[in-house]
Amino acid sequence: MAGAQRVYKQRIRSTQTLKKMFRAMELIAASRITRAREHARAAAPYSRALTRAVSAVATHTQIDHPLTTDRADTNRVAMLVVTADRGQAGAYNTTILREAERLAAQLIEEGKEPQLYVTGRRGVGYYTFRHREIVKSWTGGSDNPEVSTAEEIADTLLEAFRAPVAEGGVSEIHLVYTRFASMVSQEPRVVRMLPLEVVEGVVEAGGDVLPLYEFEPSPEAVLDALLPRYIRSRVFNALLQASASELAARQRAMHTATENAEDLIRKYTRLANTARQAEITQEISEIVSGADAMAAS
């Protein structure tokens, strides 16, 4: 019985240590998520404005631009998968990787060849463990993305889209990320960025239709200037949305882990008390038996 009591006390101490760690991670995520949400909210108007500007060019002109035209000379397709650098975020990474696998299976079924571009150590580890080739990866700072990283990612994807077939050019660019809906809801999203599909931010509910523009020096020159910025803003916005989603998922997961640790501590405390009571009962029984034996002799 004494051995069982020691085991339960050791488990209580270990669980208390884990509880402190879970609680600290919950508080850290809670302190960072406010800033992450503000950054995502602040970046949204710029992304919408660029979408509207690009939409105006694509809608009111009849041009054959490489970034808006389907490419038929290759079946390679780029997939940018946005994951986290760390775990302890519930099903956050699992959900987005499952969505990426679904997209890859769909593309393969269509006769296309997915090319993986991955952000976050979790995604890199996932594909490396499965011996899946990654064209390029970016790690570090998934919970606090920087503009320079987004620009590097976007420029790499644009370079692949513009590259000839012999140099690994791709015909499409797809983005797989997690959209922050609320503190309790984060949604995996798949967006085809190139060739350009203007599917959001064109006309808001109750808003005005796109006005007519005259483009100087030409619509092609305007697209050349706008589309790289458009892709960079979409990538950066996706990184910000994923950052807020990661922190929200981590805060929720660590809160649940803290509560589970408290339940375990209560359980082990009861078991330790039961073992102690059994030990005391056994000692009393042995004393009484010894006294009876001495009295009988």
Swiss-Prot record:
Organism of provenance: Beutenbergia cavernae (strain ATCC BAA-8 / DSM 12333 / CCUG 43141 / JCM 11478 / NBRC 16432 / NCIMB 13614 / HKI 0122)
Molecular function as annotated in GO: ATP binding; proton-transporting ATP synthase activity, rotational mechanism
GO biological process, one term: proton motive force-driven plasma membrane ATP synthesis
Localization in the cell: Cell membrane
Recorded family membership: Belongs to the ATPase gamma chain family.
Keyword DNA-binding among UniProt keywords: no
Record key words, sorted: ATP synthesis, Cell membrane, CF(1), Hydrogen ion transport, Ion transport, Membrane, Transport
Protein name: ATP synthase gamma chain
Predominant cellular place of this UniProt entry's protein: membrane
InterPro entries given in the database record: ATP_synth_F1_ATPase_gsu, ATP_synth_F1_gsu, ATP_synth_F1_gsu_CS
One Gene Ontology CC term in the entry: proton-transporting ATP synthase complex
Physiological role: Produces ATP from ADP in the presence of a proton gradient across the membrane. The gamma chain is believed to be important in regulating ATPase activity and the flow of protons through the CF(0) complex.
Membrane topology: Peripheral membrane protein
Oligomeric and partner information: F-type ATPases have 2 components, CF(1) - the catalytic core - and CF(0) - the membrane proton channel. CF(1) has five subunits: alpha(3), beta(3), gamma(1), delta(1), epsilon(1). CF(0) has three main subunits: a, b and c.
UniProt gene name: atpG
